[in-house]
Structures are given as C-alpha cells and as structure tokens.
Curated annotation (Swiss-Prot):
Gene source species: Streptomyces cremeus
Domain of life: Bacteria
Binding-site list for fumarate 2: 308, 310
Residue stretches in coiled coil: none
Gene name, Swiss-Prot/TrEMBL: creD
The protein's assembly and partners: Homotetramer.
Active site, renumbered: 302, 341
PANTHER family associated with the record: ADENYLOSUCCINATE LYASE, ADENYLOSUCCINATE LYASE C-TERMINAL DOMAIN-CONTAINING PROTEIN
Alphabetical UniProt keywords: Antibiotic biosynthesis, Lyase
Pfam families reported for this sequence: ADSL_C, Lyase_1
Identification of the protein by name: Nitrosuccinate lyase
C-alpha cells in the first residue's frame, strides 16, 4: 500500500483535534462520548475484523491459531488513529488504512497469521458491522438512562396525580388538568422511546457481503466442497455468535434499512425528551413559575445578569431534540444508494449517525437529572388557575348546563358570560349568578363544585393510574 502523503507543516496534532464538546455541551463529559468517539469506532471496526476471523476459524475457513493472533492484535492502542484518519483521504474510507495497520501489527506477532487478516472481506462489511457495534453499545446506555428517567417521571405522576394546574392550548389557559397527567404524558413518551430503543438494539445486524454483495471472496472455491447454502448458514451463524449482532436476510450494502431504523428511533427519542424540555421551559417562566429545574450552585448563571437561574438542563435537551431529527433526515436520504455500493451516500452516513447517537445519549443522561430533581410548586399551580377568575371552567359549566338549556344555548350563554367577566374584571361565577335564565336551575352546592377548577379535571386521575399501571411489571 502506498503511504499517504505526510500532513503539511503546521497541521494540527491529535491533541489539537480533540472534539470534547465545546460547541455541543449536551453531550460534553457524558458517558456516551466514550462509546462513539473516534477511538471507539476504531476499536469497533477492529472487533468486527477479529470476530470475522474467529467465525471463519469456527467454520474451517482459516486456522484457529491465525484467528487467535489477529484477535490479540486487534486493539486500538496498537493502531495510529490519526494516521488511519488522514490516510482515509486517499481511499474515501478508514478501513483500508486500518487493515494495513492491523496486518502490520499481526505480522509483528505472527507473520503467518497476517495472511488471514481481512480474508474475503471488504471495507463496507467492516465499517458497517463496526457501526452496528457502536450503535448497540450506545443504545444500551441510552436505554438504561431512559429507564431511569421513566422511573423518576412515574414518581412525579404518582405524587402529583391530583395536583390541579391550568391546561394550556395555543399558549393560553384552556381547561384545568393535573400535573400528574402532564408527567404521565412525559412518562408515556419516554417509555415508548425506551421500548423502541430496546427492540432496535436487539435487532441490529452485522454486515457481510463481500466486494459486491455475493460473498464470493469469503468462499472462494470452497463452494465445491459442500452445499453453498449450508456453508453460508454456518458462516453467518458463526459471525452472529461472535459479534452478538443479528443475522441479516441479505447483505445490506445498499439496503440501508438498519441505518434508517436507527435514524427513526433516535429522532423519536430525542423528540420525546425535547417535549419534556420545552414543557419545563414554559412552566419555569418567571410569570408562570410552576416548576423549576434542580437547584445546583453555580448552574444557570448568566454572564451578565447576576439574578438569573437559567433552565440549563432543559435547554441542553431541547438543543439535541432540534438537531437529531434534522440529522436523521440526512441518514434516511442515504436510502437512495446506487448500484452495489454507493459513491458518497454510504460515506455520508457516518458522521450524522455518530452525532445522532451522542446527542441523544447526552439528552437521555441529562433527562435523568431533570426528571429526578424537578421542583414542582403546587401552590403556584393552584394560584395560576385563578388568573382568569373562573373562566377556565367555562367548558365544564357549559357541559353541565347542556341538558337544561341545550348544547348551543349553553355554549352561547357561557361565551357571553366569559366575555363579560373578562372585560369587567369580575369572576365568571358573579356574572353567571346574575343571569335570570340560570336562576334556580342548579342547587348552590352544584354551582360551587362546577366553579372550582380543582374539581374540573375530568378523568385525569384515572388516566394517570392507567399510565402508571402500564409502567409497572405484571404481578406474578
């Protein structure tokens, strides 16, 4: 292999190229970074190479001693990561340089084994399988964090099952609801995301297709020694066992369903967490002040305003939720891959996939802290219910009056009464009490119940109970 040209004088070294999250604080310092960084991808590709040799040894395609030597050498700390990365500029993918470096490392230990490195394989098999290994490791972490966030949200929903608050539609007070129901909605989203992550993680496939999807290089003339279908089954089953990945129906070099599935699940997960974040931001506004993020000394400080306590956690999560769907769109566009290997579409997946994984991983880790430490001000929620002087119960009053006045008449009466109350600065109850058509239609106790926002939350409590029951494991 021709050595790539040396970097020009003044080119940055590895330390200067460190991507530590300066412009992406949602994932900076979180565990997912270590699982998707360059060295993690390098190790995953080496793991794919080593697993392949072991699978080939198990099926008699190469000596067991060679597989052992290759596995022993397949360590990222024995490979010059920066050289592999820069060498990829000459080959359009990092596997060519990786194979050369791995072969050299094996040759130093066992010259005979070096002949079996990358036997029959192709760059895309190695990189795609490595990508699935990276994704599986990251998804396991993301799934664990989603489960922890869901536990915290379930506790919030249970604790505030009957805590009344204003439901808001199109940014305005609509009808009373409960904070428990809002938290249950968050719980449902996170639980659904966790389920999707788990199902996807367990079904991620390895890639094995050879140069153009026929696996010809893996078998050579071996097809003369037995049924090709049997040989294929043995190799695929062995590789599945060695990688822990699922066996695909066909080589998927240009059938990019696994990547599209990752894009969809990660976009949904980030969006689900983003819904929580934007709700917290809305409820934490100074004018609303119904919730607050966990109080940590020094967090949320402004560079200019000493009094500020900014909603940092929800801001970080929301930033990821706005990025991942856009990146996922780029990944799904790569479904349009020409021929048996794309010139550019496959290559366009790598960085967006890494970003989707680490942004979602950072958001999931941040969501655990947000959900577990969220401060809820039930008294403020109750006070905010009274901001419209009772008009927030207009729907429930209209429903109660419908059997007596008719649906249209009841709605028109409440519309006029609410308008009068708002413009005259009076309560809805006062205005309704002066209407002659309502004189004596309902007993006083019934009016008091109808005009109490805390008693107009519908079946919110039952809905919360249902969400919590779905979260709990079935009794055995």
């Amino acid at each position: 292999m021709t050595r790539p040209p040396a970097p020009p004088p003044g080119a940055p070294g590895a330390d200067e190229l460190l991507d530590c999250g300066l412009l992406s604080p949602v994932r900076a310092g979180t565990p997912v970074e270590a699982l998707v960084c360059d060295s993690a991808w390098l190790q995953a590709m080496l793991d794919a190479e080593a697993a392949l040799t072991r699978a080939q040894a198990r099926t008699g395609f190469l000596p067991a001693a060679a597989a052992e030597a290759i596995t022993a050498a397949a360590r990222a700390d024995r490979i010059d990561l920066l050289a592999v990365a820069r060498g990829a500029r000459e080959t359009a993918n990092p596997v060519v340089g990786l194979v050369a470096a791995l072969t050299a490392a094996v040759r130093r230990d066992d010259p005979a084994a070096a002949e079996y490195v990358h036997r029959g394989s192709t760059s895309q098999d190695v990189l795609d399988t490595g990508a699935m290994l990276v994704a599986r490791r990251a998804l396991r972490l993301i799934g664990d964090d989603l489960d922890r966030a869901a536990d915290a949200l379930a506790a919030l929903a249970a604790d505030h099952r009957d805590t009344p608050m204003a439901g808001r539609t199109l940014a305005l007070h609509a009808v009373p609801t409960t904070f428990g129901l809002k938290a249950a909605g968050w719980l449902e989203l996170v639980s659904e995301a966790a389920g999707r992550v788990a199902r996807l993680r367990d079904g991620l496939p390895f890639s094995l297709g050879g140069a153009a999807g026929t696996l010809a290089g893996y078998f050579g003339d071996r097809t003369d020694r037995g049924d090709p279908a049997v040989l294929l089954d043995r190799l695929l089953d062995a590789y599945a066992a060695e990688t822990g990945l699922a066996r695909p129906v066909l080589p998927w070099h240009v059938l990019r369903t696994p990547v599209a599935d990752l894009a969809a699940v990660l976009a949904f997960t980030a969006g689900a967490l983003g819904k929580i974040a934007v709700d917290v931001q809305s409820l934490a506004r100074t004018e609303v002040a119904e919730v607050a993020e966990p109080a940590v000394e020094g967090r949320g400080a402004s560079s200019a305003m000493p009094h500020k306590r900014n909603p940092v956690l929800s801001t970080l999560i929301r930033s990821a939720a706005l990025q991942v769907p856009a990146l996922a769109t780029g990944l799904t566009q790569c479904l349009v891959s020409e021929d048996e290997r794309s010139a550019g579409a496959w290559h366009a997946e790598w960085q967006p996939l890494r970003e989707c994984l680490r942004l979602t991983g950072g958001a999931a880790r941040t969501a655990v802290e947000l959900a577990a430490g969220l401060e809820v001000d039930a008294a403020r929620m109750r006070a905010n219910l009274d901001l419209t002087d009772g008009r927030i119960v207009s729907e429930s009053v209209a429903v109660a009056l419908t059997p007596l006045l008719g649906r249209q008449a009841a709605k028109e009466l409440l519309t006029r009464a609410a308008f009068t109350a708002g413009h005259e600065g009076r309560t809805l109850g006062e205005v309704l009490g002066e209407l002659p058509e309502l004189d004596g239609v309902l007993p006083k106790e019934r009016w008091e119940a109808l005009l109490d926002p805390a008693r107009a939350t519908g079946v919110a409590g039952a809905l919360v109970d249902g969400a919590l029951a779905r979260r709990r494991p079935p009794a055995r």
